[in-house]
């Protein structure tokens, strides 16, 4: 366990979050979010960090993904009912900013074949990149379903201009153990990205979408 957040604290907070969500049943699956508040950090001067870490349990089961594929990848995607678009479909968007923005909004992430990935900025313009959804590379040696699972369970920490971050680390249908594992992994990874590690952390909370925040640190 990470030195600054004890195992007991973590389990207690997770228990509170899960019990809170059981008391008030929602019509949707609540996400559990890790909220981080930083200190001694100047977003203007200090390097803005970003990094990704793969969790054990997928934080968002409803995560939607689209394959921008060559013929083979489109066929593979079709076989497993995954949304996909080929180069012709992308060209039809005609670099129209509104349409590209709509595409970026429609999916949580994209995978693209090697032959397409280099052409995306030229065909679509900067829209996907601006939305923070530039596709991950999909090669032919990779199993499509495994790659999709990997993308679904990977979370990204990205420092913007403000000193607080929030990332989805799970949902309320996960077990205590699964949530604790995901949160523990996320905290350790985040702290490793910070210049002064724990000295940059002001506070850590976890909360479900509609629940009360529980303080970890």
UniProtKB/Swiss-Prot annotation:
Q: How does it assemble?
A: Component of the large ribosomal subunit.
**Protein family (similarity comment):** Belongs to the universal ribosomal protein uL1 family.
Question: Mind telling me what this protein is named?
Answer: Large ribosomal subunit protein uL1
Where is this gene product found?
Answer: Cytoplasm
State whether keyword Cytoplasm applies: yes
Q: Which GO terms are recorded in the biological process aspect for this UniProt protein? A: translation
Q: Which residues form a coiled coil?
A: none
For this UniProt entry, what is the primary localization, expressed as one broad class?
cytoplasm
**Function, in words:** Component of the large ribosomal subunit. The ribosome is a large ribonucleoprotein complex responsible for the synthesis of proteins in the cell.
Q: Name one Pfam family in it.
A: Ribosomal_L1
Which organism was this protein described from?
A: Xenopus laevis
Report which gene this protein is encoded by. Answer: rpl10a
Kindly state which keywords UniProt assigns to this record, in alphabetical order.
Answer: Cytoplasm, Ribonucleoprotein, Ribosomal protein
